[in-house]
UniProtKB/Swiss-Prot annotation:
It comes from Homo sapiens (Human). The keyword DNA damage does not apply. Phosphorylated at Ser-232, Ser-372, and Ser-389 in serum-starved cells. This is Ribosomal protein S6 kinase alpha-6. Its cofactor is Mg(2+). The lineage of its organism: Eukaryota, Metazoa, Chordata, Craniata, Vertebrata. It is found in: Cytoplasm, Cytosol; Nucleus. The modification Phosphothreonine is found at residue 581. Forms a complex with MAPK3/ERK1 but not with MAPK9 or MAPK14 in serum-starved cells.
Amino acid sequence: MLPFAPQDEPWDREMEVFSGGGASSGEVNGLKMVDEPMEEGEADSCHDEGVVKEIPITHHVKEGYEKADPAQFELLKVLGQGSFGKVFLVRKKTGPDAGQLYAMKVLKKASLKVRDRVRTKMERDILVEVNHPFIVKLHYAFQTEGKLYLILDFLRGGDVFTRLSKEVLFTEEDVKFYLAELALALDHLHQLGIVYRDLKPENILLDEIGHIKLTDFGLSKESVDQEKKAYSFCGTVEYMAPEVVNRRGHSQSADWWSYGVLMFEMLTGTLPFQGKDRNETMNMILKAKLGMPQFLSAEAQSLLRMLFKRNPANRLGSEGVEEIKRHLFFANIDWDKLYKREVQPPFKPASGKPDDTFCFDPEFTAKTPKDSPGLPASANAHQLFKGFSFVATSIAEEYKITPITSANVLPIVQINGNAAQFGEVYELKEDIGVGSYSVCKRCIHATTNMEFAVKIIDKSKRDPSEEIEILMRYGQHPNIITLKDVFDDGRYVYLVTDLMKGGELLDRILKQKCFSEREASDILYVISKTVDYLHCQGVVHRDLKPSNILYMDESASADSIRICDFGFAKQLRGENGLLLTPCYTANFVAPEVLMQQGYDAACDIWSLGVLFYTMLAGYTPFANGPNDTPEEILLRIGNGKFSLSGGNWDNISDGAKDLLSHMLHMDPHQRYTAEQILKHSWITHRDQLPNDQPKRNDVSHVVKGAMVATYSALTHKTFQPVLEPVAASSLAQRRSMKKRTSTGL
C-alpha cells in the first residue's frame, strides 16, 4: 500500500471524524476514509483535574556506592527546558565513568507543586527498577537544598517526534520496527506493575544507531497487580484512553490504547481523535467513530481496530504483550533478534561525535548552560524527597573509560549557535588544498595543541548544509572522515575534521615501486564496503576521485583509508525535501528518481574503476598524461575502450580483469554495484591472490597529472547542479513554522 502523502506539517493537521449513526465513508483532505463502528465504553463526563492521592514512596538510596553531586558534572549544553526545570548535556568529571556524557534533568523544588514533586520521586523510583534495552537508564539521582537531579542516558538521536515531523518519510515496515521495540519496552514496565500513561512521540528517544529508548516516567504509576486500578487524570489528552478520560479507573490496558494512537499518528501524520479544544477531544475519545484511512494495509487496519476498543477488557494487549506479538501486522518480526538489538533500524540520526546535539531543538541548545542555585523549598520538602539519592550498582564495572584530561577534551560542535568563533578555538596554518568553493587548511586546537584539518566554505557559492548533515549522520563509519566541529560566522562555514596525515591513497600507491594484487584487493574491499554502506543509506558521493580517498595515518594500512569531501554528495529525498528511508526508496519512489540515484551510484563505481585500474596498471585508463586535452580524454571515455593487455597486465589475473571490466562498463545499468563488487571472487578470495609485486617505472608525477586531467575533463563536460539556499527548501520552510510545545520535560 502507498503510504500517506506527507503534508507541510503533518503534526498540526486535524482529521475530521464523521459523526452520526452507522458506518459511513467519505474523504478527508482528498484521502478516502471509512468510519469504523466502535463499541461503546462507559461514557462519563469529563472532569477538571482535582486532588489526586498518589502511592507512597518506598524506595531508598542504595548503600555502598559513591554518591554524586552537581560539582561532579560539567555543564555542556541545554537540551530542553520546562516550567520547573531544565535538561542539560553534562560530562562526568570524576570517578570510574569520568568523561562519560549524560543527560542531567534538574528540577527546582520550589517550582514543583505537591503533585509534581511526587511524580518526580516516582520517576526516580521507577527508573531504579527498570533495566531494558529500549528504556532510558538512570545512573545517578541526588538532591541539594533547592533542586532534584536525575542523571540519565544521553540519547544523541533526539526524539521520534522531531525525526518524524521534520525529516523523514516512513513506511509501514519502518513504523513496524519502532512499534515492535516499543511493545517490548511497555511489556517490561507492565511486568514490573507499572502503567506508563504518557505515551507520545516526544517521550520516545533514539540512540545514535536508531533504536528507541522510552523516557520520562513522571506520570507513570506503580500498581501491585493487574487488578489494581489508578484513577488519576494524567497524560497528554490526545493519547488518553477512554477509561482515563472518564476516570472509571485504568490499568495497563490504557497504555495499549495510547500505543494505538501513536501507531495511527506515525502511519498517517494525524491524530485519530483531535477536537478544537481539550473538552471536544475528550468527548471524541469517548464517543466518536474512528476515521480509518483506506491506504493502510489490511493488517495495519486490523491492529488499529483491535487497539481502539473502548472497553479495556476487549482491547488487544489487555492479556499481555503476547497478544500484540501474535498479530499479523508483526508476522515478519523476529522478536528475539529485536530484543538483542540485532535488527537494523530504518533511520540513523544525524549525530556526529559523542557530544553532538544536532537532533535537539536549537531553541534550547543555543542557550548558555547554567544551573542556578534554586530557591530553597518549603521546610518539609526535603522530607518528601528523603531517599531520593541513588547510584547505579554497575557504574564502576560498566565504564572502562580513560579518565578525562585536557588532551582528550574537545569543544562542543557549534551547529546551533555561535557560542564560540572558529578563531577563538583553532589557529589556522598552511593550505592543504584549494577548490572552487572552499579551501582546506591545517589547524591547531588552541587548548589541546592537537592538529586537525578545516574546510572553509564560502556560503555565497555553496550551501554546505547537506554535506554537514551527511557527515553528522555517517561520519562515525570507520572509513568515512569524522566531523569534529562546525562554525558559522555568517559568510563562511568551517568544517573541522581529522587531519589525514597519511596523504592521498593514490600518492602512496604510486610511490611504491611494487604493488601486488592482494594489496589492491584489500584496498578495493575497504573502499567498496564503505561505498556500499553509503549507497544502502541512499547517499551518493558523486565526487569519488582519488584525491578524496586518503589515509588517516602514516601506517597506510587498508583500515586507515577514509573517504573525504562530501561537498557534492546527496541524500535521497522526496519532492517535499524529506529524507526517504531505504524501505521507502525500494517501494514508493518514482522510477525517474531512482534512475537518477542509480546513475549517481554508477558514477561512484566508475570512479572506483578508474582508481582500481591505476592501482594495477601503474597508469590511468583514459589519459596518457597531464597534457591530454579534455576532448581527447572524453572521446576515449565515450568509446569505452581501455587496454587490459601488455605491460603489467600480462601478469594480472583474469579475475581482476573481469571485475575491472564490469566496473568500467559503458552502460550504467550493466555496471557493477558496490554489493556486486564485494561478492566477486577476486574480493571474496583475496587471501588466495598472488602477493608477488610486479615492478613499475617511477612515473608517479605523470600518472597523477593524467588522473587530474581525467577528472578535470569530466568537470568541463558535466553540468554541476546549482544548489539553492537551504532557506528555500520546503524542509527549511516547515522547520520555521511554529513548533508544537512539548510537555515532555
